[in-house]
């Protein structure tokens, strides 16, 4: 068999595979996603009552106000930064990850328990003292960071620990806030995989929706 014939066969095979893998397959997946799962395929975006996109159900956001259920700590601050001071281009490229600190690491212990210092700029408040100051029982999800730093969920236990504070600050009945927590809790996938989690963005938007109807 001549070299030209072998080369021609190789070129044809390459072109066929290229058309299948680079054109037919990806565009088929895009079409299937847009037809069957349009919300998920477009990023699971969440809008407010005005129709404005406020985030994604898959990406967490930092919530620290007493009026809201607070998010869990994040080593990347949920990939947020000051638009006027962003030398690492976090807002442009995004960033995720964990601290990977060992349980015995002093930096992790200081972040959790706090570290007083005569110089206020060097003092570390600590997650546990911050929670106790707000009359919130510390739970693992409110003290430790997640592996990605972008987790959109907190545990039902972490949400329940904040119910009284949120209800008090907003002047809402405790049972009404409890119902919101239950409604915004995602159960185990297929009933067996993973653990239940409360989607924080959905829950806090539901709180604002109540405030707008009062």
UniProtKB/Swiss-Prot annotation:
Gene Ontology MF terms in the entry: ATP binding; P-type potassium transmembrane transporter activity
Principal location class: membrane
GO cellular-component term (any): plasma membrane
Topology within the bilayer: Single-pass membrane protein
InterPro entries in the cross-refs: KdpC (IPR003820)
Entry's localization field: Cell inner membrane
HAMAP family, sorted: KdpC (MF_00276)
Function: Part of the high-affinity ATP-driven potassium transport (or Kdp) system, which catalyzes the hydrolysis of ATP coupled with the electrogenic transport of potassium into the cytoplasm. This subunit acts as a catalytic chaperone that increases the ATP-binding affinity of the ATP-hydrolyzing subunit KdpB by the formation of a transient KdpB/KdpC/ATP ternary complex.
Similarity comment: family membership: Belongs to the KdpC family.
Name of the protein in question: Potassium-transporting ATPase KdpC subunit
Encoding gene per record: kdpC
């Amino acid at each position: 068999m001549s070299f030209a014939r072998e080369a021609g066969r190789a070129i044809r095979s390459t072109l066929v595979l290229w058309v299948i893998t680079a054109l037919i397959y990806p565009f088929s997946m895009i079409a299937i996603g847009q037809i069957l799962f349009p919300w998920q395929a477009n990023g699971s975006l969440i809008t407010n009552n005005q129709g404005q996109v406020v985030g994604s159900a898959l990406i967490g956001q930092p919530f620290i106000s007493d009026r809201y259920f607070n998010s869990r700590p994040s080593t990347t601050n949920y990939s947020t930064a000051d638009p006027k001071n962003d030398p690492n281009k976090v807002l442009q490229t995004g960033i995720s990850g964990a601290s990977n600190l060992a349980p015995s690491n002093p930096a992790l212990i200081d972040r959790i328990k706090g570290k007083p210092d005569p110089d206020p700029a060097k003092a570390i408040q600590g997650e546990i003292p911050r929670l106790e100051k707000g009359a919130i029982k510390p739970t693992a999800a409110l003290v430790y960071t997640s592996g990605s730093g972008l987790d959109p969920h907190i545990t039902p236990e972490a949400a329940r620990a904040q119910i009284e504070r949120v209800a008090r600050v907003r002047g809402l009945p405790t049972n009404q806030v409890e119902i919101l927590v239950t409604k915004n809790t995602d159960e185990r996938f297929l009933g067996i995989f993973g653990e239940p989690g409360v989607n924080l963005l959905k829950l806090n938007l539901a709180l604002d929706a109540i405030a707008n109807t009062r």
